[in-house]
From Swiss-Prot:
Homodimer. It comes from Arabidopsis thaliana (Mouse-ear cress). Residues 61-738 form the Myosin motor domain. This is Myosin-14. Residues 1069-1084 have a biased composition (Polar residues). ATP binds at residues 155-162, 208-216. Residues 890-1056 form a coiled coil. Keywords: Actin-binding, ATP-binding, Calmodulin-binding, Coiled coil, Motor protein, Myosin, Nucleotide-binding, Repeat. Disulfide bonds: none annotated. One of its GO terms (molecular function) is calmodulin binding.
Length: 1516
């Protein structure tokens, strides 16, 4: 895509021997020759065909996909990669190919879990390039299309292939992994196989500290659901020669150094020492590596072995074999006793030989013989041949290489067996980590095999790239012709052709015993002397050169024959097969063919060739994905980009070949809107225009076609969504566009100069007008000042005249008032004197009348007292007779009392029996009620009979009293005693009447309850309450009767003593009126007390059982009531208040054991199962938070309940105390007011209450999190659409951005309006359910923080979002959120607006004009103080102005940021530029309580449903 036509001032790329390509400006054009002034300062003269056009409008930070480059050529690709590498963007797409540049430093923010979550499900190319995107695309295609996939990772040593493979396997394991509960052993073993294989297959080379010395193909198998079901690891061509030969400054395999750094007990067990003392390790001066701890790696490797299924015994055996190889390498050989023989050189060699034999667990002498001798078997005899020193050393090295190779193969097979392969697997994803193309100063057999592999893969790669090009053209439905590409089949035939290929000749030479590398080279020279891809170097007799696709490579044939032979010495096979160690013996099994033939030749090249055929067959059945790893420099240091080195790797990796294939067709592809936006200035008249000048009716493809026809361009193609241009056509269009823009610039300059001149004229005219206005104003002010002075003089004169007249008037007024005052005072004093005289006369008359009236009253009072005394004496004597008759009634009442007690006990027992059997014996309940009713009627009849008997006895006593003559003159000896007896009798009568009344009430209640069968529980409770009251009344009556009886007895005795002097003794039987003496009494005091105590104990046991049953029923009723939405009262939840009042009344907080808390927790847990109903969740959040607040206030530390007064243990004592302590109505009302004023009172809580408080706190936090997460999920979909302005076509997008109206109903802000409405909806829901403001505030603060994180991270991950127009769009959306925060009170919004500080500052920076004038200090301290250097750097490098095409910040600012980032590169936290989401609970129970202290529950009303339940009467 060289330049065809250039003009002076055009920017081009020219070749440079130092930096490969350098840009410059054309300063002279002479035909086909041009002069270019380079940016380095030098001027070069070149042909036009040697220069390549430069895209001056390309973004400074490069593009994600190099197919989007305007000019797809080598310098453009190289510059794009270098620009991205400078801003730590190490990944770039070339179509579907990912190019990865090794940064040689840790970038943890690119590979954390958050980044992995970003790429899950994202479309390929939607986010920044990343290996996760390639792995996700492969996984999605596998699941959606049902086709197996493969990912090929290639690159030279040190390019980062192994690390990239780890990332791919990590992502695939996460995507296809099972849940933790199902066990994730397969994917864990796949991941942990990497450190094991690295320990035994990786080593330090000149180019890489952790170079893989083997090829690896990992097959990850998946089931139909896309879960990993198995895996297999295939390895290729382990570099066996490294075990014995190491060049400086390289190292041997890592496992040798790890073993030498093992714990002391392992070192002692295997007799190890410092690595410098072992021959296989001290050939190089490099023993230790920076940033690598061998001891730590040893421990990590052992752990990884445990995970992949290698048990501890097998691990011990593995490292025992590795230690044996080290000791074997220290065995040196000297001359033996016989000629041409060898033997261990000294005691040190004998020690290591003995140690190696002990570790191999074989015979020491047999090991020595296998190294120093060979047994030749002929037809008739067996000949033992001694080996010389050199041959013995080669035999030793051969044994070491064979043992290590067999050990490595065993580890790979063990890992495969442990992971397991799924025979029913539907699909697989293969990850190929293969060595890249190699060309060194000395290239041996390993480089030959490696380059053969790359030739095969390059052929597969070219075919895939060609297929992608065809798919792209077919997708866009354009006409295309066959595209030629370089086919390397001739090179492959040269190497691997069955008859006459290099591998065939090599195998043939290995079969001949006398063949050497000279004969092999001579055979190749003769066979391929005419082949165009094969040549012989001039200065060498045995070397040969092959022209590979990546360049010419010269191979040295000295060791080709030895390295191609793959056979085991018969003595070594026999020796180790007979080892006492089962593990060592299993490495060398004795095969049937080995028994027949002592040594069998097999070709490594043939086996490797067969492995490649199998690999390519597997790859051909899969959909390939390519990752090309690039090493930026050979120093292995960060921030260094060597152009020549990178360009060579791009050529070797086939990237340039892929670009060449693209250039052969249509290298430039632009979307319609991008093409019109860039080149619409060439032919604006071909577009249909509306009133505002933008396309209206014509579509973008028609506009593009008209534009290209207008400029007379040939060879282009119009697809469905893109314009396809031939090579060089983009440069031609750019040249024409620059001419149009130049003319437009001149026109703009002319208009601008005219504008400046007019502005100057208008300014001068305005200044003259202002000066005239100032002069006229000064003259007017002078005239106005004279007029104002005249008006002031007149005003002063008027005020003085008014003051004089007012002063004269006041003097006359005060004189008249003084005269009137004197006359009126004299008249008033005369009237006062007359009134005093009149009052004195009246006072004298009143005292006289008072004396006469008082005298008359005293006389009447004295007469009345005399009359009253006589009458009271008569009444006292009559009352005494009544008391005597009442004493006779005591015995009858006592009998009635005992009968009532029996009836009460029987009634109590029947009620309890009814309660137990009420669920399954409804008929029995009716019978029991009838029995109770009949019992009550019988008791009432008995009471009436007792009462009638009492009346008869009273009448009889009256008749007897009438027959006995009583002297009227007997005086009352003790008046106080009579009054006391009278009062006691009155109380007794009142108690009897109250008992009668209560019995009547009980009868009425039973009659009412019998009509309602559904309310059986309430009937039992009220009946039992009535019975308890009856028992109390009966006991009270019993005590009062005993007291009255004793007092009547004393009074009767006194009366009889007083009347004995006048009346004859009359014998009266004690049984006639029911009165007995103390000895004959049927119930004395002790018996009554014992009987009462027994009844009390039985009653208490029954009462406890009854209370437990009733409490369970009450809890069920409470839960059935509050589980429904019973609303709010005075802005507070009724359910929480009702629950708290019940818990407080039932004393559940002070109980050691109770089930009420468990049932409440279960009720709350089942109520919030519907996680998506925010209305329901808000209701329960309000209730749980309020209940938690009330419990928090009650269970405060240091709270002590009121001390209880001691309760008497005696039944009669408790009854008496109840009568004595019964509160008056005033006291009752005062207590009620105190209780209402203090609903929440402190209690001492036990463990169940404290546990319930913790569980309630957890539910508050859970419901809070559910509402918050529901809101986040609702906003998630809208946020993904709010980060980028809608863009359907060029005209439409430009119109929307140039529109001056930004009302809320505009279509670009629909998604922001959705967020606005969603916030209002959740706020109204929370307010309607009276959720505490502190919880609402925290919900919105965390939601705004979530919005900030999502928008800011999307801004940093997607370059198309970092534009000027998109910044304006996001800023308008943020204005809506600010409007919402302003409309919402601070009580609910809080600091929500401050949570958007990152996205606000980022968007504010994006919409600033003339960013190139802003310094770094202004950005970091004034504009964006909250953003880190990494975040600012990424925004500045990703930003591009799609509206005005202005520049971003200056290069000095970018350089300053880069220096600061380099200084912080070692800090993992500082290098992370993405924000993390905060999902913690931002409040505690104390915070909730402190915010709700002002709530008053004094006038709260409980649930209406419970008010009708008598058991909850305490709520009213």
């Amino acid at each position: 895509m060289a330049c065809t036509t250039v003009n002076v001032g055009s920017c081009v790329w020219v070749e440079d021997p130092e930096v490969a390509w350098i840009d410059g400006e054309v300063i002279e054009v002479k035909g086909s020759d041009i002069k270019v002034k380079c940016t380095s300062g030098k001027t070069v003269a070149i042909k036009v065909s040697s220069a390549y056009p430069k895209d001056v409008e390309a973004p400074a930070s490069g593009v994600d996909d190099m197919t989007r480059l305007a000019y797809l050529h080598e310098p453009g690709v190289l510059q794009n990669m270098k620009s991205r590498f400078d801003i730590n963007e190490i990944y770039t797409y070339t179509g579907n190919i990912l190019i990865a540049v090794n940064p040689f430093r840790r970038l943890p923010h690119l590979y954390n879990n958050h980044m992995m979550q970003q790429y899950k499900g994202a479309g390929f190319g939607e986010l920044s390039p990343h290996p996760f995107a390639v792995a996700d695309a492969a996984y999605r295609q596998m699941k959606n299309q049902g086709i197996s996939q493969s990912i090929l990772v290639s690159g030279e040593s040190g390019a980062g292939k192994t690390e990239t493979t780890k990332l791919l396997m990590q992502y695939l394991a996460d995507m296809g992994g099972r849940a933790v509960s199902e066990g994730r052993t397969v994917e864990k073993k796949v991941l942990e196989s990497n450190p094991v294989l690295e320990a035994f297959g990786n080593a330090k080379t000149v180019r890489n500290n952790n170079s893989s010395r083997f090829g690896k193909f990992v097959e990850i198998q998946f089931d139909q659901r896309g879960r990993i079901s198995g895996a297999a690891i295939r390895t290729y061509l382990l570099e066996r020669s490294r075990v014995c030969q190491v060049s400086d400054p390289e190292r041997n395999y890592h496992c040798f150094y790890m073993l030498c750094a093992a714990p002391p007990e392992d070192i002692k067990k295997w007799k190890l020492a410092d690595p410098r003392k072992f021959h296989y390790l001290n050939q190089s001066q490099c023993i230790e590596l920076e940033r690598m701890d061998d001891a730590k790696e040893y421990r990590e490797t052992r752990k990884a072995m445990d995970v992949v299924g290698i048990n501890s015994e097998e691990q011990e055996a593995i490292f025992q074999v590795v230690a044996a190889i080290l000791h074997l390498g220290n065995v040196e050989f000297g001359k033996g006793k016989e000629a041409d023989s060898s033997a261990p050189k000294d005691d040190t060699s004998n020690y290591h030989l003995k140690t190696a034999a002990e570790l191999f667990m074989c015979d020491e002498q047999a090991l020595e013989d296998s190294l120093c001798k060979r047994v030749i078997v002929t037809r008739g005899e067996t000949i033992t041949k001694c080996l010389d020193q050199e041959s013995a050393a080669l035999s030793r090295d051969a044994l070491a290489k064979t043992v290590y190779s067999r050990l490595f193969d065993w580890i790979v097979n063990k890992i495969n067996d442990s992971i397991g392969q799924d025979p029913d697997s539907e699909y697989l994803i293969g990850v190929l980590d293969i060595y890249g193309f190699e060309s060194f100063k000395t290239n041996s057999f390993e480089q030959f095999c490696i380059n053969l592999t790359n030739e095969k893969l390059q052929q597969h790669f070219n075919q895939h790239v060609f297929k992608m090009e065809q798919d792209e053209y077919n997708k866009e439905e354009i006409d295309w012709s066959y595209i030629e590409f370089v086919d390397n089949q001739e090179i492959l035939d040269l190497i691997e052709k069955k008859a006459g290929g290099i591998i065939s000749l090599l195998n043939e030479a290995c079969m001949f015993p006398r063949a050497t590398h000279e004969t092999f080279a001579e055979k190749m020279y003769q066979t391929f002397k005419d082949h165009k891809h094969f040549s012989k170097p001039k200065l060498s007799r045995t070397d040969f050169t092959i022209c590979h696709y990546a360049g010419d490579v010269t191979y040295q044939t000295e060791q080709f024959l030895e390295k191609n032979k793959d056979y085991v010495v018969a003595e070594h096979q026999t020796l180790l097969n007979a080892s006492r160690c089962a593990f060592v013996a299993s490495l060398f099994p004795l095969l049937a063919e080995d028994a027949n033939k002592k040594s069998k030749f097999s070709s490594i090249s043939s086996r490797f060739k067969q492995q490649l055929v199998t690999l390519l067959e597997t790859l051909s059945t899969t959909e390939p994905h390519y990752i090309r790893c690039v090493k930026p420099n050979n120093l292995l240091k960060p921030l260094i980009f060597e152009n020549q080195n990178v360009l060579q790797q791009l050529r070797c990796g086939g990237v340039m070949e892929a670009i060449r294939i693209s250039c052969a067709g249509f290298p430039t592809r632009k979307k319609f809107e991008e093409f019109l936006e860039r080149f619409s200035v060439l032919a604006p008249e071909v577009l249909d225009k509306s009133t505002d000048g933008w396309p209206l009716s014509s579509t973008d493809d028609v506009a593009c076609k008209k534009l290209l026809e207008k400029v007379a361009l040939q060879g282009y193609q119009i697809g469905k969504t893109k314009v396809f241009l031939r090579a060089g056509q983009m440069a031609d269009l750019d040249a024409r566009r620059n001419e149009v823009l130049g003319r437009a610039a001149s026109r703009i300059q002319r208009k601008f100069r005219s504008y400046l001149s007019r502005k100057t004229f208008l300014m001068l005219r305005k200044v003259a007008t202002n000066m005239q206005a100032v002069c006229r104003g000064q003259l007017s002010r002078l005239i106005f000042e004279g007029l104002r002075r005249d008006a002031a003089v007149l005003e002063i004169q008027r005020d003085i005249r008014m003051h004089l007249a007012r002063k004269s008037y006041k003097e006359l007024y005060f004189a008249a008032v003084s005269i009137q005052l004197g006359i009126r005072g004299m008249a008033s004093r005369g009237r006062l004197r007359f009134q005093r005289q009149d009052k004195a006369a009246i006072m004298i008359q009143s005292h006289c009348r008072k004396f006469l009236a008082q005298l008359h009253y005293q006389r009447l009072k004295k007469a009345a007292i005399t009359t009253q005394s006589a009458w009271r004496a008569r009444l006292a004597r009559k009352e005494l007779r009544k008391l005597k008759m009442a004493a006779k009634e005591t015995g009858v009442l006592e009998a009635a009392k005992s009968k009532l007690e029996k009836q009460v006990e029987e009634l109590t027992w029947k009620l309890q029996l009814e309660k137990r059997m009420r669920t399954d014996m409804e008929e029995s309940k009716t019978q029991e009620n009838a029995k109770l009713r009949s019992a009550l009627e019988e008791m009432q009849l008995q009471f009436k009979e007792t009462k009638a008997l009492h009346l008869q006895e009273v009448e009889a006593a009256k008749k007897m009293a009438e027959t006995v003559p009583v002297l009227q003159e007997v005086p009352v000896v003790d008046t106080e005693l009579v009054e006391k007896l009278t009062s006691e009798n009155e109380k007794l009568k009142s108690l009897v009447s109250s008992l009668d009344q209560k019995i009547d009430e009980t009868e009425k209640k039973f009659e009412e309850r019998s009509k309602i069968n559904e309310e059986r529980l309430k009937q039992a409770i009220e009946a039992e309450t009535t019975i308890v009251n009856l028992k109390t009344a009966v006991h009270e009556l019993q005590e009062k009767i005993l007291d009255v009886e004793s007092e009547n007895k004393i009074l009767r005795q006194k009366s009889l003593i007083q009347a004995s002097g006048h009346l004859p003794p009359t014998p009266v039987k004690g049984s006639q009126n029911g009165h007995f003496s103390s000895k004959e009494s049927p119930f004395n005091g002790s018996e009554i007390e014992t009987l009462a105590r027994t009844q009390e104990q039985e009653s208490d046991a029954k009462t406890r059982r009854y209370h437990l049953d009733r409490q369970r029923e009450n809890i069920g009723a409470l839960i059935n009531c509050v589980v429904n939405n019973i609303g709010f009262n005075q802005g507070k939840p009724v359910a929480a208040f009702t629950i708290y009042k019940c818990l407080l009344h039932w004393k559940s907080f002070e109980a050691e054991r109770t089930s009420v808390f468990d049932r409440l927790v279960q009720m709350i847990g089942s109520a919030i199962k519907d996680e998506g109903d925010n209305e329901h969740l808000a209701y329960w959040l309000s209730n749980t938070s309020t209940l938690l607040f009330m419990i928090q206030q009650s269970l405060k530390p240091g709270a002590t309940p009121q001390q209880k007064t001691p309760v008497s243990t005696s039944l009669f004592g408790r009854m008496a105390m109840g009568f004595r302590s019964a509160p008056s109505s005033a006291e009752t009302s005062a207590a009620a007011e105190a209780a209402a004023a203090a609903v929440i009172r402190p209690v001492v809580a036990k463990d169940p209450a404290l546990l319930f408080k913790q569980q309630l706190t957890a539910y508050v936090e859970k419901i809070f999190g559910m509402i918050r997460d529901n809101l986040k999920n609702e906003l998630q979909t809208l946020l993904s659409l709010c980060i980028q302005a809608p863009r359907t076509s060029t005209g439409r997008s430009l119109r929307s951005f140039r529109s001056s109206k930004t009302m809320r109903n505009n279509s670009p802000l629909d998604h922001w309006n959705g967020i606005y409405d969603g916030l209002n909806a959740i706020l109204s829901t929370l307010q309607e359910n009276f959720v505490p403001p502190v919880l609402i505030q925290n919900i919105f603060i965390q939601t705004f923080s979530f919005i900030n994180v999502q928008l800011f991270n999307s801004l940093l991950l997607r370059r198309e979002c970092c534009t000027f127009s998109n910044g304006e769009f996001v800023k308008s959306g943020l204005a809506l959120l600010e409007e919402w925060c302003n409309e919402t009170t601070e009580e609910y919004a809080g600091s929500s607006w401050d949570e958007l500080k990152h996205i606000r500052q980022a968007v504010g920076f994006m919409v600033i004009h003339k960013k190139y004038r802003i310094s770094y200090d202004d950005i970091a301290h004034d504009l964006c103080p909250i953003l880190s250097v990494q975040q600012l750097y990424r925004i500045c490098t990703l930003y591009w102005d799609d509206s005005y095409n202005t520049r971003s910040v200056s290069q000095d600012v970018i350089a300053n940021m880069r220096v600061l980032m380099t200084e912080d590169s070692n800090n993992a936290d500082s290098s992370a530029f993405l924000l993390d989401e905060d999902s913690s609970i931002p409040f505690s129970a104390d915070d909730l309580s402190s915010s709700m202290k002002e709530k008053d529950f004094a006038e709260m009303k409980p649930a209406e449903e419970l008010e009708e339940n008598p058991a909850f009467s305490f709520l009213i």
